[in-house]
Curated annotation (Swiss-Prot):
Residues 1-22, 79-124, 236-325 are annotated as: Disordered. Residues 286-303 have a biased composition (Polar residues). The lineage of its organism: Eukaryota, Metazoa, Ecdysozoa, Arthropoda, Hexapoda. It comes from Drosophila melanogaster (Fruit fly). This is DNA polymerase alpha catalytic subunit. A zinc finger (CysA-type) spans 1296-1327.
Length: 1488
């Protein structure tokens, strides 16, 4: 068989003598001996006796539907079976050629004739397929039962399927899947981590149970149904065996009795490619094309009897901790099928009576809206459902463009375009628009009127009054826009507003439609030619005929929607390098109520369709395995084209309102749309609800027009915080699943699972299981109810809310608010002026909002106080302001309408007066806050039903999210309501409030150890929980009485706090339960152990160290335990006890691997490129790449020795080995060192010693770091000895002009004979030389000057060295990237760069030179007497050095910085006139 379905299959050859004919020969030889064939059950008719016409008809049915296109047109039946063709099994080359000539090709067939080919070998040979099967061990005795071929024949004769099943199980042994080893690795890693962290021995029985677990047991536990009570009302459908999609015979059966999801209406096999056909499994076909009514009844009765029979207990019983939802999904399909009767009736009901009269009123629930401003301008499509479940498409036409023409103050001269003295009137504007703009746009008619509007925003290049008269113009929305270029100047029109507003926005604002709601439509027409796939489609020419339904009393709930969850499996085609679909699972619910708690399970119909990857063939035991598979309805197709055609047919019947998927751009919806378009599947637009002919290209969501798309991954990124947002992590964090309850299937595992039929059924179950997890995640996170509430609050569309467009939500909220207040809204920014990032990628936090064109923040963000680093074992009180920025906006009435933009962008605007009317922005926030308070009051009501409780909770969450994100639109540069001056004013008041609160707390004699934007950490110095809360209440009352809207509250109490630096801390958070007992819970922020780009080994060790540091032991015992843990992990790594998965490092690709410019220093990029190239992986932007650092026999850097874990496992001759030194020095050591660096009693060198590393490197780096930190700190102690101060300085060297001997000068004197001392300038160091240095004093002075210049030049060369012990890279250049406030090393990318020669070093060196010539500071007990000439010489050299020192500003000490903390405390006291001292002269800096 060929490797690719696109190549013709080679002819079969009779080369296997031990095959079918050899078996028949053995059967003949056994005839007449004692080994007789005994058939237990007498069979009347083994073969049917028919005439030649009937035989030809049956043979045609058998072969025609399998591989002949167009139902066999052009072919003639030769009345032979395939095994009668001797030429097909001929050994000779000539026989093969003759057989090809005999077969021929029909003239009308589309099949191309086969070319002469050489005998296929290797994987392409059919031998390879059979050789993969596990051979059966032969017995010594020969009997009929032992003959496989005879057993197959008898199995076909017998009617009992059990005998065939038993025999097939003996022939085809189940193969173990490769994912088992990975599961064992994960289990071992999990067990090791638990034992390391908890130090608790696992029970022997549980450990044996974990070791005995396998994929088969897990899937049996998942798939085998529990014993259920029989239910006679269960509706049963077609058998979940493989369906070959035959053409049905025309029967007079009624349409209403057909299964809406049956595949008998269309033959998708005709869409299969010829090369993709596979004929072997046809000999084992289990279903006939047509069945009689009696046979169907018998089948139904047998199924009922089978379902009603009590289930036998299975050995693989599920765990007690398994959730009920999972058991309903995969263990109890009978209860799910119970809902299918209603499902079928509802679907058929919606298809009937879909016509509607134009005289009637149409009332429907609007879900989604769509417009195409290019192809259909001025039109909007609304999609929804009626109360009886019919899908509706409303086409609204004639939505006019609305322009607001701002008049100039004076008319412009038509020629010079300079202002004249003539004032502009509304008539002037009308005339210019009629004569110039209307003619240019070719307007046949337009309407205009004079209106008074307000404008409160900033327009670039023009000055717009806050309120004035405008000319409002309405014209056909299909006409183009007026000329808005900057070069175009109108004589009377200063600016045209509203030109960029699209039809959908105008329609929603004019009709006051805020999200999904009930709409009532009158005056419509039924479309004669439908443009949609909905049950009901009407066209409306008057937009005003769309009205909101005003119900008296409680509003009517929304109708149930139809939900469809999709999960797609893909494989890479190595020839085309494209992802091809090989499996699609579908879960659907046709009555999913969004305003009620989600049903359990969240679907009432399920099915799965599959085809084979291009590089594999169907396994021989597939039909047998699928006959036993009862977990879902499976549809098998022989090509991707047939699969997608079937999918579109089912998709259209379901007519879903909501599509649920996970990471739609990752081989899910994108692959479906790409392959449907690429394969040219007819009517591809059925993916959406509009009948379209042209694809949208890369605009994925527009293929699903009219249907909401819920991407669970994207919604989870907005709803929760997680280490990663892949499906495995979300299932573990949200659904509380265990590692054994989900299996990840990668590309390699997928191909291996297609080798056996049993593995394919497992793959189907895993695909269905993942699909059910998507629905559970959507329901657990309340994605749809929350999106509905947010959309109703903001007034945008559901699709944009589900896509995470936070900026657009706020934009529509303000659009509705300003429109209701008769304001002109700002124009949309052109797309060309925006960055490529969408709303979901934009930072909307406000404090971090930056212009991408600028290198620094456009305005100052939130205030972050300098932390007092250390370990706090007394209780620390955490307090924060509730919704600080929204409260500031309300407190100071900050709005577009109340605050004027300053002329200078760097200046802060002035706050409005207290008598100013509240602005629109504060009013909207007040409405949101008060609404949330009212909802929370309703939640506190007793006897509240679960449905109302859920609705109130989701409502208050939506109000909170909307209010907290309102500030974001002010600071987001690409927002339509961007107002930098307002955002800067809000953050300025936030910094001011935090500073005032800090000072107030300090006045109460409490230390604020840290503060960040809206929170404070206060050290109480006590360990009484209740007393700490009393202190918090006192602080709260003192602060809150200063403000009206701002509210400071207690956020928690830390029993122990490890404060490392800004935004990095760990703490034990205390809380009391209902019984008054204290509960301890760890809280981490910014630490390495919460980041995913560290290995699990480093994270595990870091957590163990953190547990010890935050424990209640004394500090010495903590450090001893930490050191013991490190020595233990060092030993276990050396012994190979640590499981391999713990060494895996995970990093995310921020772009496509090919787009990285310098991938050599990025290990995850190297691994992604290599795996994509060599192992057919599909790593792309946003994916997480796992790798390990190995020793590969090269001298490359560690970052260039990264390999995937699979590469390490499959390495030949153990060429790859783990680099344990890398993990000790680059993973464990830095993580632990950063945690304990603030503790006294340990340091980096001690940690290195515990890990078996060289501690000297870390001591040197610690000294360098200490020197730099000492240099940067202004308060270094000056009480040092001369030896301590100048121990690293170099002595002064000069050369004698006579003997050329180098003179070494460490002080003014050098030792002489008999313990005496001699002045250095008095005598040459060489005793034979008679020339004293004082005689060439000028030369000595010049050499001193040159020496000082060398030291200065050395400093300005700015040589840097990496502080990482394994790097020590020297360089003079550095990047702007910082690490710990120092430049990042570009070589290792893990260390920071330190100066080799710092300002402190230079200053000490110069001071040392000056000290040499200062005779008064020499500490000799008996100083020699010097002549006046020598004293003057020393004084001259002293002044030379001192003059150099005076030119340096390093000698100036800033007392304001030195005593900053003391001055801050003094500022809190009543001000007293004090002398201001800024600096002191250099003389004080020289005190020793």
């Amino acid at each position: 068989m060929s490797e690719s379905p696109s190549e013709p299959r080679a002819k079969r050859q009779r080369v296997d003598k031990n095959g079918r004919f050899a078996a028949m020969e053995r059967l003949r030889q056994l005839k007449g001996t004692k080994n007789k064939c005994k058939v237990e059950d007498q069979v009347d008719d083994v073969y049917d006796v028919v005439d030649e016409r009937e035989y030809a008809k049956r043979a045609q049915e058998k072969y025609g539907d399998d591989w002949i296109e167009e139902d066999g047109t052009g072919y003639a039946e030769d009345l032979r079976d395939f095994f009668e063709d001797e030429d097909e099994y001929s050994d000779g080359e000539e026989d093969r050629k003759d057989s090809k000539k005999k077969k021929g090709v029909a003239p009308n067939s589309k099949k191309r004739p086969r070319e002469n080919e050489k005998p296929v070998t290797g994987k392409a040979s059919i031998k390879n397929l059979f050789s993969n099967a596990v051979p059966k061990k032969m017995d010594v005795k020969t009997s009929v039962k032992d003959d496989d071929i005879l057993a197959d024949i008898l199995g076909e004769i017998k009617e009992e399927p059990a005998a065939t099943s038993e025999k097939a199980e003996k022939v085809i042994a189940p193969a173990k899947i490769s994912v088992t080893s990975r599961k064992f690795d994960a289990a071992a890693a999990k067990e090791y981590m638990n034992s390391f962290l908890n130090n608790i021995k696992v029970q022997e029985q549980e450990r044996k149970k974990a070791e005995a677990s396998s994929d088969n047991e897990m899937l049996e536990r998942i798939l085998k149904p529990k014993a259920a009570v029989p239910n006679t009302k269960v509706a049963f459908f077609s058998s979940p065996t493989i369906k070959k999609e035959p053409m049905p015979e025309k029967t007079p059966a009624k349409k209403a009795t057909e299964d809406p999801f049956s595949d008998n209406e269309m033959d998708f096999s005709c869409l299969d490619d010829d090369e993709n056909q596979f004929d072997v499994e046809k000999t084992q076909q289990t279903e006939k094309v047509s069945q009689t009514k009696t046979a169907a009844e018998k089948t139904s009765q047998s199924k009922v009897a089978e379902k009603s029979a009590p289930k036998k207990e299975t050995t693989g019983s599920p765990k007690e901790s398994e959730s009920e939802d999972i058991s309903r999904l995969l263990n109890n399909w009978e209860s799910i099928c119970q809902m299918d009767d209603d499902f079928e009736k509802s679907v058929l009901t919606t298809e009937q009576d879909s016509t509607i009269s134009s005289d009637q009123q149409l009332r429907f629930w609007y879900w989604e809206a769509y417009e195409d401003p290019v192809k259909m301008p001025g039109e909007v499509f609304l999609f929804g459902r009626t109360a009886d479940g019919k899908s509706v498409c409303l086409r609204v036409q004639n939505i006019n463009r609305v322009l607001y023409l701002l008049p100039r103050q004076f008319l412009l001269d038509p020629i010079s375009k300079e202002p004249t003295k003539q004032k502009v009137t509304v008539a002037d504007i009308y005339k210019e628009f009629d004569s110039e703009v209307a003619n240019q746009l070719k307007l046949e008619f337009f309407r205009s009127r004079k209106v008074t509007k307000s404008f409160a925003h900033h327009a670039i290049g023009i000055e717009v009054p806050q309120s004035c008269d405008y000319l409002e113009v309405h014209y056909d929305g299909k006409k183009p826009l007026p000329n808005l270029s900057a070069d175009k100047k109108y004589n009377s029109i200063a600016h045209i507003f509203g030109a960029t507003t699209n039809a959908l926005e105008r329609f929603l604002l004019d009709r006051k439609i805020k999200g999904p709601c009930w709409l009532q439509v009158t005056g419509f027409k039924v479309s004669p030619t439908p443009m949609s796939w909905c049950n009901t489609e009407v066209t409306l020419t008057e937009p005003k005929n769309v009205e909101l339904v005003q119900d008296k009393g409680k509003p009517a709930p929304p109708p149930p929607l139809t939900l469809l969850s999709l999960n797609v499996r893909t494989s890479m085609n190595p020839k085309t390098s494209r992802n091809e679909i090989c499996m699609i699972s579908m879960l659907t619910h046709n009555r999913f109520h969004i305003d009620r708690p989600a049903p359990q399970p969240a679907f009432n119909r399920h099915m799965c369709a599959l085809t084979r990857p291009a590089v594999v063939s169907w396994p021989l035991d597939l039909n047998f395995e699928m006959a036993k598979y009862k977990s879902t309805t499976v549809h098998k197709h022989d090509s991707e084209r047939a699969l997608l055609s079937w999918f579109l047919a089912q998709y259209q019947k379901i007519d879903a309102d909501l599509i649920v998927t996970f990471d739609s751009m990752d081989c899910q919806l994108n692959v479906i749309t790409d392959q449907i378009v690429a394969l040219k599947i007819p009517q591809w637009s059925r993916m959406g609800r509009l009948r379209l002919s042209q694809s949208f290209g890369k605009r994925l969501l527009e293929h699903f027009v009219g249907r909401m798309v819920c991407d669970v991954k994207r919604s989870a990124e907005e709803c929760i915080r997680a280490r990663s947002y892949d499906l495995q992590t979300l299932c573990k964090q949200v659904l509380k699943l265990k590692e054994s309850e989900r299996m990840e299937v990668n590309a390699d595992d997928l191909l291996e699972m297609y080798e056996k039929g049993e593995s394919i059924t497992k793959l189907i179950s895993l695909t269905m299981q993942d699909n059910s997890y998507l629905l559970r995640l959507m329901c657990e996170l309340n994605i749809m109810p929350l999106a509905l509430q947010i959309t109703n609050i903001c007034g945008n569309t559901m699709t944009r809310t589900l896509q995470g467009g936070r900026s657009e939500r706020n934009e529509f909220l303000l659009l509705h608010a300003f429109h209701e207040k008769n304001y002109i809204v700002p124009d949309k920014k052109p797309v060309s002026k925006r960055s490529g990032a969408g709303d979901t990628d934009a930072t909307l936090s406000g404090a971090d909002a930056t212009m991408q064109t600028k290198k620094k923040a456009a305005y100052a963000g939130g205030l972050v106080l300098e932390p007092m680093r250390g370990l706090y074992e007394k209780y620390v009180l955490l307090m924060d302001f509730n919704s600080l920025y929204p409260s500031i906006i309300q407190e100071y009435n900050i709005c577009f309408t109340t605050v004027q933009q300053p002329v200078d962008a760097d200046e802060l605007p002035t706050l409005p007066d207290s008598k100013t009317e509240p602005g629109i922005l504060p009013l909207q926030l007040k409405r949101l806050v008060e609404s949330r308070k009212e909802v929370k009051k309703l939640m506190a009501a007793p006897d509240l039903s679960p449905e109302l409780q859920m609705q109130y909770h989701i409502r208050q969450m939506a109000l909170k999210l909307t209010a907290n994100s309102m500030y974001g639109c002010l600071g987001f540069a690409h927002s339509r309501f961007f107002a930098q001056h307002l955002a800067a004013l809000v953050t300025h008041k936030g910094r001011e409030i935090l500073t005032n609160t800090q000072q107030l707390v300090q006045k109460m004699n409490y230390d604020v150890v840290y503060g960040d934007t809206d929170s404070l950490m206060i050290n109480t110095n006590i360990t009484d929980y209740d007393q700490v809360y009393k202190i918090g209440h006192n602080i709260k009352q003192s602060v809150n009485k200063l403000y009206k809207q701002l509210e400071l509250d207690i956020d928690g109490v830390f029993g122990c706090l490890l404060l490392l630096k800004k935004k990095k801390y760990a703490a034990i958070k205390l809380s009391k339960d209902s019984k008054g007992n204290l509960r301890r819970e760890q809280e981490h922020k910014g630490l390495d152990i919460v980041r995913r780009d560290w290995s699990q080994l480093a994270v595990m060790v870091g957590k163990a160290v953190l547990d010890e540091v935050l424990s209640e032991k004394p500090l010495e015992e903590k450090l001893d335990a930490v050191h013991a843990q490190l020595e233990k992990i060092k030993t276990q790594i050396a012994e190979g006890v640590v499981p391999l998965p713990l060494f895996v490092i995970t990093k995310q690709l921020t772009r496509t691997p090919q787009e990285y410019a310098n991938s050599a220093s990025l290990p995850h990029v190297q691994v992604a490129l290599r795996m994509n190239r060599e192992r057919n992986r599909r790593y792309k932007k946003g994916d997480m790449v796992d790798y390990v650092i190995c020793l590969d026999g090269t001298t490359n850097a560690a970052m260039q020795r990264a390999y995937h874990l699979d590469e390490l496992k499959t390495s030949e001759d153990k060429k790859l080995q783990l680099d344990t030194n890398y993990y000790l020095g680059h993973q464990i050591h830095p993580v632990v060192t950063r945690m304990v660096e603030v503790l006294e009693g340990t340091d980096a060198s001690r940690i290195a010693e515990c890990l078996g590393m060289d501690p000297t490197k870390f001591r040197q780096n610690a000294q360098r770091t200490q020197r730099e930190n000492t240099e940067q700190s202004e308060g270094e102690s000056l009480l040092k000895t001369t030896l301590q101060l100048y121990r690293l300085c170099e002595p002064f060297r000069f050369q004698c002009v006579t003997c050329k001997t180098e003179q070494l000068m460490a002080s003014a004197y050098r030792p002489g004979p008999s313990n005496s001392h001699i002045a250095v300038l008095q005598q040459c160091a060489k005793s034979e030389c008679q020339t004293a240095p004082i005689q060439y004093l000028a030369s000595v002075r010049n050499q001193l000057q040159l020496s000082m210049r060398q030291y200065v030049q050395r400093f300005y060369k700015n040589w840097l060295v990496c502080d990482h012990p394994d790097c020590n890279f020297n360089t003079r250049t550095h990047s702007l990237r910082k690490k710990s406030h120092r430049p990042l090393c570009q070589k290792c990318r893990s260390g920071s760069l330190l100066r080799q020669y710092t300002e402190r070093d230079l200053y000490n060196q110069l001071c040392y030179l000056r000290f040499m010539f200062d005779l008064g500071k020499q500490t000799l007990q008996q100083k020699p007497t010097l002549t006046p000439e020598l004293e003057q010489a020393y004084q001259l050299l002293y002044e030379t050095v001192d003059q150099q020192l005076q030119s340096s500003s390093y000698v100036i000490i800033s007392l304001s910085k030195l005593f900053a903390r003391s001055l801050a405390q003094m500022s809190l006291q009543p001000s007293v006139a004090q002398p201001q001292i800024e600096a002191i002269p250099s003389a004080l800096a020289d005190v020793v």
